[in-house]
Amino acid sequence: MRIWGKVLGAFFGFLLGNIFGALLGLWIGHRFDRGMGLNFRRAPTQQQQVVFFHATFAVMGHIAKASGQVTEQEIRVASNLMDRMRLAGEQRARAQESFRQGKEADFPLRETLAEFRRASQGQRDILRFFLEVQLQAAFADGKVEANERAILHIIADELGFSRIELARILAMAEAQMNFFNRAHGGQYQDGGHGGQQYRQEAPSRDRLKDAYQLLGVSESDSDQEIKRAYRKEMSKHHPDKLAAKGLPPEMMEMAKEKTQEIQQAWEWIREARGIR
């Protein structure tokens, strides 16, 4: 129980010379204690990051095994993710072991997800980022199979996302894949993701459509609605905010890549619509 804010607040308030000052100081101290309590509860720990790290690759391995046999493309997606996270040596070995565990027939999917949700303290931005990473595995061969979709339903259920929310995030993830492939010549699943520069020429009609979907909006939405959606997506995926909520340092580069794609989608839409 944190009371020092209340004690000090009341003391300095009393120095003002009356009971009202003390009460005001007590109230301010109470608000301070509450704020500090939230910060302590939400501060990411190494254990939280370990749980996130393991769950990411274990669940990815489980999705890869959903069709019965792990394909070369699915292995490549996992390997490319490790490359983007700059994993080497012991860290890479841990990621590979987690991926292998996820492929086992008796892998405890729901228990792993429940542990991850507890470790992340139910923070929606972190849970959504995790789900978006898993969608990369599901889209490894360019489409989501029925068995993979069934696993995604379980993931969404355990993380607290409705089917409607999952469908929306799934559509945005597919748009992200198409957006990148059209901008870079189809390299998304082949690992040409990190550090890419977007082409400067005007976007095609298809690229513009993907840009709208990546922001979760449609062409019929108003400029203000699109601008609001852009800012919301940037806030959700801001690397520093995600790190403060428990995102492992190794995944910071992925968060940066996501914000770059959101930024580019907005720039293309803004230019096409003449938004200032």
PLM regions and their residue ranges:
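Catalytic "initiation/cleavage/transfer" segments centered on a nucleophilic residue
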Residues: S67
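Small-residue-enriched hydrophobic alpha-helices in membranes
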Residues: M1-H62, E72-H237, A243-R276
